[in-house]
């Protein structure tokens, strides 16, 4: 999995974290899986956005956070374990849900990760992903201002590649809206080249041109910025 340094981790908190109000559709989308008394593994927890969200949304659920980057763990200010998808530092059959938010495109060995997921999941457990997939990106407004970033999609897997690579079956797939920013002006003030996999594919000139387009639009357009990421729920093959 990709490892972030201290500068990238700090930028991530500025550029990528979304308010809990903006994420409210995700609370509703995952609620069926976050049952009282269950244990959730936030795998690739980053700076802890969803650790904090789940604590507020689902107070009767235990969340265990695992993150490979020491800088991200430090920036979170939360208790997190060092580990990654191919080596999860948890006992066998210890979690009911594995949550992975914008993580799976960083996983280098899906087969090894799938074996680890099956190991730590209890019978009947599920893997719940919040992600962008190569063939499903029309809901991402970033491409309007940074069209060259589309070339980075080649590094993102398809839904089938994720499910087949991990060795799970698709149980649910749908686009979930989220309010990424209260306005384009807010979005322009927080966008960071180093904090986004898509933007890091841009040259300095491409990034500057895209930010100029974003600022120009922000001067005349009002209203919230709404993007869509996919919810993908995976179950063990056969549903066992």
Identify the residue ranges that each predicted region occupies:
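Conserved class I S-adenosyl-L-methionine
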Residues: 1-35, 49-53, 57, 72, 126-154, ...
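Conserved Class I S-adenosyl-L-methionine
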Residues: 19, 47, 172-240
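A conserved beta-strand element that flanks and buttresses the S-adenosyl-L-methionine
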Residues: 99
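Short alpha-helix
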Residues: 153-167
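Class I SAM-dependent methyltransferase SAM/SAH-binding core
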Residues: 41-43, 47-87
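Short catalytic micro-motifs in class I SAM-dependent methyltransferases
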Residues: 102-106
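A short glycine-rich, Lys/Arg-flanked "PGG" loop and its adjoining helix->strand segment in the class I
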Residues: 111-123
